[in-house]
């Protein structure tokens, strides 16, 4: 079994399911004995990137900060899961080059479905003009051109998405077979306990 660190970079629109899937992967990998950290975009913005706005420059600065932390943890054999919209290709590509052991996971979901899942009411605020520069509404989201994994959360269950990610990590040499094919039946209960289902 390889215990080398790597970074899973979850990118996608707000409401696509990045945090939910990040928690699912975290739960599974911790159960297999891995050290795992999640860098959630919302949490990073309130701590590490407090004071940054949503201009292209500020968003890229936010991504560079997340990538810096991921790089440090990766070289110390930690699995990092960055769950951030990260709307611009150039910033994601910079993160890939900077970190090294990097797996881009595109959490694809139609904006109409993301709007339905909008528990924070952000799309509504953006539609009303109360939030400017909101990704997918009045600021672009540049889809990945060659992601390592594509997850379609409007078509797959959480369990299917988790298995898809784990199998791909095995194919890329980041996980051993025994880390992939563990029982995932406890996952749903854990996600319910965390309030994601």
State the predicted function of each range.
Residues 23-68:
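Conserved substrate/cofactor phosphate-moiety recognition/catalytic segment
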Residues 10:
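Hydrophobic anchor at the beta1->P-loop junction of P-loop NTPases
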Residues 18:
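Conserved lysine of the Walker
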Residues 181-197:
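Catalytic domains that recognize anionic headgroups
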């Amino acid at each position: 079994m390889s215990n080398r660190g790597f970074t899973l970079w979850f990118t996608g629109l707000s409401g696509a399911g990045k945090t939910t899937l990040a928690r699912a992967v975290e739960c599974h990998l911790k159960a297999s004995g891995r050290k795992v950290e999640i860098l959630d975009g919302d949490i990073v913005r309130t701590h590490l990137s407090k004071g940054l706005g949503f201009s292209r420059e500020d968003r890229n600065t936010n991504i560079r900060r997340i990538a810096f932390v991921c790089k440090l943890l990766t070289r110390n054999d930690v699995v990092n899961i960055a769950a951030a919209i990260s709307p611009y290709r150039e910033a994601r590509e910079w993160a890939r080059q900077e970190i090294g052991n990097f797996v881009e996971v595109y959490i694809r979901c139609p904006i109409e479905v993301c709007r339905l899942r909008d528990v924070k009411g952000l799309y509504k605020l953006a539609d009303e003009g109360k939030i400017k520069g909101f990704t997918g509404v009045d600021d672009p989201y540049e889809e990945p051109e060659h992601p390592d994994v594509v997850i379609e959360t409007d078509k797959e269950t959480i369990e299917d998405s988790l298995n898809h990610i784990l199998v791909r990590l095995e194919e890329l040499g980041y996980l051993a077979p025994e880390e992939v094919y563990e029982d995932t039946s406890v996952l749903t209960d854990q996600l319910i306990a965390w309030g994601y289902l």
